[in-house]
Structures are given as structure tokens and as C-alpha cells.
Amino acid sequence: MRSRLISWAWGLLTPVLLAFLWEFFSRRSIAHAYAFVPVADIWRSFWELAGNGDLALNLWATLRSALLGLSIGTLLGISVGASMGIIKTADVLIGPIYHMVRQVPLLGWIPLIGLWFGTGVFSKNLIVAMAVFYPMALHTYEGIRNVEKPYLEVGEIFRFGRWQRFVHVLLPNAWPYIFTGFSNALAFAWVATVGSELLFATGPGLGALMLIAQSASRMDVVIVCIVTIGIIGCLMNFGIGKIRKWFLGWHCAH
């Protein structure tokens, strides 16, 4: 317990030091105060946004978009990855296209998506779904292809059909790979959601709020949004890490 508290204390040292340096530069001159907004002003803006509901409204919009894109990308990724891993014809037909397309940076699709679908909510959700789809499909494929031979022989002994073999043999043994892919996909979804809001500034969202604050020279609001995005991302990473640790322990036990 004591070692954990010491570890937490050391972990807080860097943020405190950065806050001290930030405050130091903000008080050097007016020019520095514009770029490095005093911590007191940032704190005041946080309570202002929290009090009038703007922070909650935009945060919920970003979380909702991330969750929708995560759900769609996960389902499609598992479906495509499983198809390539199980059906050789699907691997031959889909595999080359998938591996070629995933080499294109996500930002490279922005002009095409904007041209085809405009700059609305659908385009933002599509970007998030694409960011999630790639790691989910790859890890599902790798998980199914790396199932050990003894497990496959069990399916042959029981004369499982293709669906039974997938449900009772391949999928249970591929879950660690799939969960690792989901951990990565969750981080990608959050980053892609905020990025899409910055690129397609339509509707509420933390990214849109940052752009509005930037145009109004409200650097304090921009910093509040950045810190909020970082904290939510850390909480997601912490939560999925705990779930992954529990899940892998349960999976090994069963």
C-alpha cells in the first residue's frame, strides 16, 4: 500500500511541475499570458463550462460518436477478420485489398469522405469506424489463424461443422487477440472522434468547442477541452486495462 502511494506521488510530480512552469511563463508578459493562460483562468473557465452545461453537452456528443463508431467498427472488424481467418477464399479475395487499404493513413481518406458524404455526422462516424475496423480485423484474423493444433484436432474428433468449429474452438481461443485489438481500437476511436470533430466542425463535440474557442481567442477554453480529452482518454485506458487483466485471468482459468 505504501509503495503504491509513493508511486502515485511520483506520478503527480510531473503534472505539478508542468503546472508551475505554465504559471511562470503566463506571468512573464502579456504575450506569454495569451499563449500560456494563467492556471486560475483555466480553472475558472472549467467551472463556467461545467456550470452552464456546455462541457457536459459537448463531452456527451463526443462520447456518443466514439461509442457508435467503436460499435460499428468492432462488429465489421470481427466479421471480416473471422471470414479471412476461416474461409480461404475470403482471405484470397479480401486479404490483399484489406492490407492495401490499411496502409493508407486515416487522414488520407478525409478528402474523399468529405466529397462523397459531406461534412456531417455520418462522415465523422465513418472515420471513427474505419479507425476501429483496421485493428479489430487484423487481431481477429491473427487470433483465428494462431489457434494451436490440439484445439483444432478436438473439433475434428467431435466432427464439428464450420459454425460449431468457429463458436466452440476458434473464437474462444482467439479472444485474447481480439481483446488486445479492442484495447487498441478504443484508443484509436477516441483520437479519431476528436480529430473528426476538428476536421468536420458540425454539431456539438469537444473538437467543435475547441474550434469555437480558438476563433474567439479563448485559449483558456481550448486548454480545458484538451485536458478533458486527455483525462477521459486516460480513464478509458485504465478501465480497459483492468478489464483486460480480469478477462485474461478468467480465460486462462477456463
Regions found by a protein language model. Name each.
Residues 1-26:
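N-terminal signal-anchor/first transmembrane alpha helix
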Residues 126, 130, 162-194, 229:
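Transmembrane alpha-helices
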Residues 115-116, 192-228, 254:
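Glycine-rich helix-loop "coupling/hinge" segments at transmembrane-helix boundaries
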Residues 28-71:
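Periplasmic/extracellular loop-to-transmembrane helix junction in inner-membrane transport proteins
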Residues 139, 143-178:
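Short cytoplasmic-facing helical segments at TM-TM junctions of multi-pass membrane proteins
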Residues 88, 145, 176, 180-183, ...:
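C-terminal transmembrane helix and the adjacent membrane-cytosol boundary/short C-terminal tail
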Residues 68-98:
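Transmembrane-helix boundary motif in ABC transporter permease subunits
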Residues 99-135, 142-143:
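Generic hydrophobic transmembrane alpha-helix motif, especially the helices
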